[in-house]
Swiss-Prot record:
One of its GO terms (cellular component) is cytoplasm. Disulfide bonds: none annotated. Its main location: cytoplasm. It is an enzyme of class 3 (hydrolase). This is Protein/nucleic acid deglycase HchA. The active site is at C190. Gene3D superfamilies: 3.40.50.880. The lineage of its organism: Bacteria, Bacillati, Bacillota, Bacilli, Bacillales. It is found in: Cytoplasm. CDD domains: GATase1_EcHsp31_like. It comes from Staphylococcus aureus (strain Newman). Its EC number is 3.1.2.-, 3.5.1.-, 3.5.1.124.
Amino acid sequence: MSQDVNELSKQPTPDKAEDNAFFPSPYSLSQYTAPKTDFDGVEHKGAYKDGKWKVLMIAAEERYVLLENGKMFSTGNHPVEMLLPLHHLMEAGFDVDVATLSGYPVKLELWAMPTEDEAVISTYNKLKEKLKQPKKLADVIKNELGPDSDYLSVFIPGGHAAVVGISESEDVQQTLDWALDNDRFIVTLCHGPAALLSAGINREKSPLEGYSVCVFPDSLDEGANIEIGYLPGRLKWLVADLLTKQGLKVVNDDMTGRTLKDRKLLTGDSPLASNELGKLAVNEMLNAIQNK
């Protein structure tokens, strides 16, 4: 007989690979994960056939987020937030390159993998080798960025690991500068917009000041995520709060699957936005190619 959801523990689960580190509680996973997503088909299968334009994904290589109380959250990139948007992009005909800050393997929250979702699982299997052996972002900047680069968009998936390193990386700053200067897309969701903070490093103001974004609500990281044991403590800083302080406009305070386009910046509020953000990115990229 299956266990009643209300009987599941709200205590975070210890991660035995690291001192004082924790996975989300069983109860929180029952609320936040599912075997399938809301994927409802690809709208533009094979629509892009020329083979030039690609997507550069900046993924997380660090698993642990140190919290205010000294505990660590065992995280990574959220598999739905990464793989469902990429499924739409790859099925439309765009190749994907994977980079991390140091070239170390990508870390994923496998506990959030929708194991019965063919779209997500098939994309994971196609990308697994690149996820294990990604490019080093500094090498991409040196060798593959410029006005003639083949990258049409930069994609930064979420998961709490996006708050570690990426938000204060000068390499990420250079990549975002390149995207803005060369009229390329920046696509990100949930905690991924933490990467946008890098644009303001050592500057009086961020080049993204005035842009509107969707982002994971700070209120959940401060409240429900702790109460149900998803997080084992409070984050040292909050994504929407710091984005607002850099002059960006956060348009949501809840988690509904909302997406937003502001110029070439495409954002989503949570894993619930993954499917629609993938569709939005494909539509915008195809339109941009037609108008080039």
